[in-house]
Amino acid sequence: MRGGGGCVLALGGQRGFQKERRRMASGNGLPSSSALVAKGPCALGPFPRYIWIHQDTPQDSLDKTCHEIWKRVQGLPEASQPWTSMEQLSVPVVGTLRGNELSFQEEALELSSGKDEISLLVEQEFLSLTKEHSILVEESSGELEVPGSSPEGTRELAPCILAPPLVAGSNERPRASIIVGDKLLKQKVAMPVISSRQDCDSATSTVTDILCAAEVKSSKGTEDRGRILGDSNLQVSKLLSQFPLKSTETSKVPDNKNVLDKTRVTKDFLQDNLFSGPGPKEPTGLSPFLLLPPRPPPARPDKLPELPAQKRQLPVFAKICSKPKADPAVERHHLMEWSPGTKEPKKGQGSLFLSQWPQSQKDACGEEGCCDAVGTASLTLPPKKPTCPAEKNLLYEFLGATKNPSGQPRLRNKVEVDGPELKFNAPVTVADKNNPKYTGNVFTPHFPTAMTSATLNQPLWLNLNYPPPPVFTNHSTFLQYQGLYPQQAARMPYQQALHPQLGCYSQQVMPYNPQQMGQQIFRSSYTPLLSYIPFVQPNYPYPQRTPPKMSANPRDPPLMAGDGPQYLFPQGYGFGSTSGGPLMHSPYFSSSGNGINF
C-alpha cells in the first residue's frame, strides 16, 4: 500500500508538473493578457530546476543565472520577463530607457541576496556595462539635438569619410558636433560630423579621405581658403609622420610663409622615404617612365586669385595623386631617344632632356636625383616606383661574379655617376637584346651577353655551382671525354654524387677514385647520359651483381625478417654460404667452412 500511495503521489506530482510546464510554455509564466510570444519554442532546459523537477528542489545561483541568460537571449524586455511564483515581483512598466534600466537594477539587487560571489561579480559587470551604454546613448542623443536646431537639421547615418552636407553658413556650430563625433567614434558608430572642418580622428585615414574633405572644403567660399589650405597641409604632415589625424579645430589662418614651410617639410619627408637609393652615388631607382619632364608648376599660394579654384585648395598629396598619368606615346618617344645597341644615351639628347626641367627642380634634385619642387611633385607613376630598385638589385646580383680586370662591374660607366642623367635601357629593349643567340658551339642561356667572364672566355654558368643543361653542341659536354679536359674536371665529383647507389655500380662506394671513374665511363657500350645508366642498362653483366653484403663485424645481430632479401636460404637450415663466396656473417655460423656447425 505504501508503494501504491507513492505511485499515486508521483502521478499527482507529474500532473502538477505538466500543468506548470503548459502554463510556462504558453504564457511564459505571465497571465494571458500580458503573454509574450517568444522567438522559438520554450524549452525546459533554461528554466530553473525547481520548475521542471518539483517545487522542493534546492535553488542555487546557477539556476537563476541560466534563467536570466535565457530571458536575455529571447529578446524580452526586462519589465515583462517571466519570473517564477516564488519570485513574483511587481515591476512597473517604465516607458523610458532610464527607468527601465533602474528597475532592472533594483530587481537584480533584490535577486542577488542569495547568490554567491562569482554570480554577483558577473551581474555587477553586466550592470555597469549597460549603465555606461545607456548614459552614452542619452548624452549623444541629447547633444545631437543642438546642431539640429538649425533649419538644415541632421542627416542620415553615413560613414565618416563621406562628404558633409554643403551648408553656406555652417561656421556657427563646429564645437558641439566635433565632441559628438568623438564620442560616437568611440562607440564605433559612423555618424556625420556636421561642420565645415570635418576631421576623422582615426589612424587609418588615407589620402582618399583628405581628397574628399579638401574637395568639399574648396566649394565653401573664398573667405576661409587660407585656413583650409593650412588644415589640409597639416593633415598631410601628420599622416606622413604616421600619427593619427587629430581635429584641427583651434588652427588659425596661417600666412603664406607657414604654408611654404609645411610644404617643404612634406617634400623632405617624401624625398627621404621614396628616393632613398642603395648607395651614396647610386642611382635612386628612377626608371625612364619617371624621368619625363613634368608640367610647369602652378602659381604659388601667395598669388591666390579671388575665384574659388579647386586645384589651389588641394594639399600636396592630393596634387600628387591628381596628376594625370603620362601618355604612353610620349613615353615611347622618350624611350626611342637612345640607340638600342649602346649603353649610354647620346650626349646632345641628354642635355636636351635636362634642359626641359625647370631650374627650381634642378636645384631641388641634388645628388639623389629626385625631382620635387615646392609646389608640385613629379611622381607621375607612383605604383611603379618600388619595383625599380628591386630590378636593379637583381641585375647587380647577376653581375656580382663578372667583374672587369679593374674590379668594377661592366655596366658601371660614367653615365651612372652623373645622377639625374642616368637612364637605363627600357625593359622592352632589354628583352630584345637578351634573346638567346647560339653562336659557335657555346650554349648561351637567357642572361645578358655582358655576363660572360672577363678572364675565361666561357659563359657565366660554368662558374656557378649547378651543372648546365645537357646541350650537345660541344664535344666537351659528353661524359666520356670529361676526364680528358682539365677545364671541366671540376664537375666530375658532383655527377658522382648525383647517382644514388641502386645496386648497379658498386664502385660508387669510393666516388673519387680516378681508376674506377675511368672504368665505369669507358666500359659502357654507348655514350651514357646524365643519370640514365641505372635505368637504361639494368641487365649489364657486372661481376659484383650480388645482393648487398652484411657488415664484416661478427657482433652485429642478423637482420630481422622483412628487411629485404638479405639471405638466399633461411637460417634454420644452417646454409650460410654458397660456392660464390660468403653471403652473410653471423655469430652463429663461421664464414670459413661451409657454414654448417652442429
UniProtKB/Swiss-Prot annotation:
<dbReference type="InterPro" id="IPR031496">
    <property type="entry name" value="DUF4688"/>
</dbReference>
<protein>
    <recommendedName>
        <fullName>Uncharacterized protein C1orf94</fullName>
    </recommendedName>
</protein>
<dbReference type="Pfam" id="PF15752">
    <property type="entry name" value="DUF4688"/>
</dbReference>
